[in-house]
Every structure is written in C-alpha cells, then in structure tokens.
C-alpha cells in the first residue's frame, strides 16, 4: 500500500475531520479530484468509508507503517 504524496495529504486532512469541500479548498483542487483521491485511498487501505480510513490511518501510524 503506497499512497501518493497527494493522497497522503488528503488522508491527513480527512483525519483532521475536514469535509470533502474543505479538503478541496485547502489543497486548491476540485471536489471531483478530492473524491477521486478518496476513492483511491479507500481502495489502497482496503476500507469502505471515511471512518474506516481514519481508523486504518491510526492503526498504520501505531505500527509505524505510516507517519
């Protein structure tokens, strides 16, 4: 599971609780692009939604596989 730099940025903002619109504004990308990044992140993390992605993020950080 290798996230691109941009996917990692999106994931970190997701973990902070930002909405898709807020992530789009923060990164100066379209909402469509944000959704595409999230879909890719979910697939790579083998999760189905935002909550599972956040849980998986913290599991990976704890295992030192993601910082």
Please tell me what each predicted stretch does.
Residues 1-9, 66-67:
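Regulatory hinge/linker segments at domain boundaries
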Residues 7-9, 25-26, 43, 59:
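Glutamate identity and glutamate-enriched acidic tracts
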Residues 14-18, 57:
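Short helix-to-turn junction characteristic of helix-turn-helix DNA-binding domains
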Residues 43-67:
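Basic, Lys/Arg-enriched C-terminal extension of HTH/homeodomain DNA-binding domains
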């Amino acid at each position: 599971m290798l996230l691109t730099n941009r996917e990692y940025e999106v994931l970190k903002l997701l973990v902070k609780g930002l909405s898709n619109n807020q992530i789009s504004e923060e990164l100066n990308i379209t909402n469509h692009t944000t959704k595409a990044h999230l879909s890719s992140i979910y697939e790579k993390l083998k999760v189905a939604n935002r909550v599972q992605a956040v849980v998986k993020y913290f599991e990976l950080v704890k295992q030192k596989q993601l910082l």
